[in-house]
């Protein structure tokens, strides 16, 4: 989506694109750009790397160490996401994976024994409204569509919840989001991590 919108902008058609800009969508969707954004805003993320070929994937896994969470970049709804714990599982995943410079794989440190939160919010560029903070019953890494959630969260401290609200607001305002967005956080030992961000015209079409 962000590539298509950027192409329209380059054509110079004087189109008025309502909502989140292509630039903001790309910053949310591109791994390196979002990591740079998170560092500027002092938001913690799991260690992660990007790879465009098999050798790069294996180097990334070796550097990060098992278990890892691996997934394609720029996909809908977390398709192709797997938690890998050993070389045999990695070999099986790579047998099915398609990699290229414009279709990289994202390899992240898997935070075991972590609690996952799904946060839905909307931003108009000036204010952020948080619609729901959902706590996953399953441990972090299970796709949202396969998980069970509690609203409101049952096992999260007030301090962490306050930080979730603060980070959600920071992301919406600093990225310049105008519309809906979804953030997936992980909590381990009272430490908060940003794991995924979805933002576009539909709130679940792009991910970082």
Kindly give the residue locations of the regions a language model identified.
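Single conserved hydrophobic/aromatic residue that forms the stacking wall/gate
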Residues: 198-208
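N-terminal beta-alpha lobe that positions the nucleotide/phosphoryl donor
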Residues: 1-183, 187-197
């Amino acid at each position: 989506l962000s590539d298509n919108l950027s192409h329209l902008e380059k054509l110079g058609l004087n189109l008025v694109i309502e909502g989140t800009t292509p630039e903001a969508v790309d910053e949310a969707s591109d791994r390196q750009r979002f990591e740079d954004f998170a560092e500027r805003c002092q938001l913690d993320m799991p260690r992660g790397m990007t790879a465009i070929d098999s050798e790069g994937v294996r180097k990334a896994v070796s550097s990060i160490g098992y278990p890892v969470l691996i997934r394609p970049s720029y996909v809908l709804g977390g398709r192709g996401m797997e938690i890998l714990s050993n070389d045999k599982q990695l070999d099986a995943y790579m047998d099915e994976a398609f990699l290229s410079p414009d279709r990289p794989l994202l390899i992240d440190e898997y935070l075991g024994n972590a609690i996952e939160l799904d946060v839905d919010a909307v931003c108009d560029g000036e204010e952020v409204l948080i619609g729901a903070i959902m706590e996953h019953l399953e441990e972090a890494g299970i796709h949202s569509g396969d998980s069970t959630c509690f609203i409101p969260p049952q096992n999260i401290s007030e301090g962490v919840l306050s930080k979730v609200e603060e980070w959600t607001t920071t992301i919406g305002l600093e990225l310049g989001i105008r519309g809906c967005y979804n953030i997936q956080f992980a909590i381990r030992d009272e430490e908060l991590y940003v794991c995924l961000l979805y933002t576009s015209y539909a709130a679940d079409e792009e991910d970082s």
